[in-house]
Amino acid sequence: MPFKIAHISDTHISPEHNRNNIRKLKSLLTYIVDRNYDHIAITGDITSQGSQEELRSIRKLLKHFDLLHSNRLSIVVGNHDIFGGVHRAEDLLSFSTKCKRVNYKKQLGLFQRAFKELHTKDDFNLLNSYPYIKLVDQVAIIGVNSIPPYSRLGNPFGSNGRVDDVQFAELSKLLSHPALKDYSKIVLIHHHFNKYIVQSDGIAEWLYHRFEALTLELHGYRKLLKLFSNEGVSAVLHGHTHIIATYMTLGVSFSSTALIPLNNDNQKLHFNEVTVLNQNNVTIAPVVVDPQKSPAHTSENIPEKW
């Protein structure tokens, strides 16, 4: 039987910014849950600022749909979940200083504890919270943290990516484990592996997105890509760029999506349907949802503050 994953990313939930995104996410989850997908994967930037208030709101929504179960939902962290983000142009110059002050370990811990039910107990003798693995049917879902701590040169705005040497070694050991030889390996990570294309309607917007593109890189992506290819990874699911895309590199299929993508009608909601037929056969197809036609387009069961 095909194993179907609903891939969501970059929901950016916030009571202060993007106030409608909680309703949009509810519409999207209603659509997905009603269609009985085997699993849901959310690849980071679930929150806008990484605050406890935002995390509590998302927990409440996921609990409403009975999704706080390891076999139903997998989540990886994004840069907004650690460092937050810029919502006003005047805050751009001070944002690097804000990132420098972030307690990285504390923020990552808050994120992990917010979704503690989703952690797996599959015993592969892993040392840290990332990478993680869960075995669902004949699919091995592997979560990777691509968000490094602040660095003045390497990660001044918190949005660049890197998988450090310790995590890479664990990931390499995990992907080559003999117990996974009959499983389709699906990797979840926040950062992208394709070229970020700047799209804009004017010079000011172009300059902003051009600056953004220079600070959205995944350092060491070629090394990761080679590992994924050599170890037979079937697909990599990611977000970060807010671009809907499917692409293939070195025999590995990639899924890129966002709740409200830059390259589509921003009144519609989006996710990718990842269908795993076997180790050598994975298909990825974008799905568009009109929230106006969704039964969840209502204030029912939404906290009043939203």
Identify the residue ranges that each predicted region occupies.
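Active-site-proximal beta-strand elements of phosphoester/diester hydrolases
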Residues: P2-P15, Q138-R152, I186-L188, V252-I260, ...
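Active-site environment of divalent metal-dependent phosphoester hydrolases
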Residues: H12-E16, T47-Q52, V77-E90, P149-G154, ...
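Extended active-site neighborhood of metal-dependent phosphoesterases/phosphodiesterases
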Residues: S57-K173, H177-K181, L227-S229, N272-E273
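Conserved beta-sheet core of the metallophosphoesterase superfamily
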Residues: K63, V102, D201-L277
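A short C-terminal boundary segment appended to hydrolase-like catalytic domains
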Residues: L277-W306
